[in-house]
Amino acid sequence: MKIIGILGIQGDIEEHEIAVKKINCIPKRIRSVSDLDEIDALIIPGGESTTIGKLMVKYGFIEKIRNLDIPILGTCAGMVLLSKGTGKEQPLLKILNVTIKRNAYGSQKDSFEKEIILDGKKLNAVFIRAPMVDKILEKTVEIISKDGESIVGVREGNIMAISFHPELSNDGIILYEYFLKNFVEKN
């Protein structure tokens, strides 16, 4: 069985652990840099990107994650952290060739659910203070999901990033299965 780590320093950690179990993988909460050596893939969860970034710096995660050669999925704040920039000064991994507009859909009270398409399948996506891709910086970045004209899902190499929270959706398992099939099992 594949072991999928969930960065466990802030954010929707438990919900991702439940989803990982549903796709017959073993979840591992990542609390220290050494935990990263024991996983086949990594999920960087939603939460507060500035807080997660500062904690990643404090505990030495930035360089280690930048040098990982495993699939990485970033959801919501995780998408922000993977990006090259946000227009705001904050710690970022800078390993995904996109810039991000933070809180593109508004505040917490503007949260919503909307049906999107991922890999030809309908998925009810939960957007909470969600970011969106502002600009694609390299042709190696592939759009995998949109909300109208807004880009809400991308992939580049072994990195996948989405604006929404699949761990909070009844059919979010579709996204985890996509990540497993197209990233984790191919690594």
UniProtKB/Swiss-Prot annotation:
Q: What is its EC number?
A: 4.3.3.6, 3.5.1.2
Q: Which SUPFAM superfamilies match?
A: Class I glutamine amidotransferase-like
Name the reaction it catalyses. Answer: aldehydo-D-ribose 5-phosphate + D-glyceraldehyde 3-phosphate + L-glutamine = pyridoxal 5'-phosphate + L-glutamate + phosphate + 3 H2O + H(+); L-glutamine + H2O = L-glutamate + NH4(+)
Q: Which GO terms describe its cellular component?
A: cytosol; glutaminase complex
Q: Which GO terms describe its molecular function?
A: glutaminase activity; pyridoxal 5'-phosphate synthase (glutamine hydrolysing) activity
Tell me the keywords, alphabetical order: Glutamine amidotransferase, Hydrolase, Lyase, Pyridoxal phosphate
Give the PROSITE patterns listed for this entry. PDXT_SNO_1, PDXT_SNO_2
- Pfam families, sorted: SNO
Write out the residues that bind L-glutamine. 47-49, 102, 128-129
**Which is a GO BP term held by this UniProt record?**
pyridoxine metabolic process
Q: Where is the active site?
A: 76 (nucleophile), 165 (charge relay system), 167 (charge relay system)
Q: In which pathway does it act?
A: Cofactor biosynthesis; pyridoxal 5'-phosphate biosynthesis
What CDD domains does the entry give? GATase1_PB (cd01749)
Taxonomy, superkingdom: Archaea
Q: Which family does it belong to?
A: Belongs to the glutaminase PdxT/SNO family.
Q: What functional role does this protein have?
A: Catalyzes the hydrolysis of glutamine to glutamate and ammonia as part of the biosynthesis of pyridoxal 5'-phosphate. The resulting ammonia molecule is channeled to the active site of PdxS.
Subunit and interaction comment: In the presence of PdxS, forms a dodecamer of heterodimers. Only shows activity in the heterodimer.
Q: Which HAMAP family match?
A: PdxT
Write down what this protein is called. Pyridoxal 5'-phosphate synthase subunit PdxT
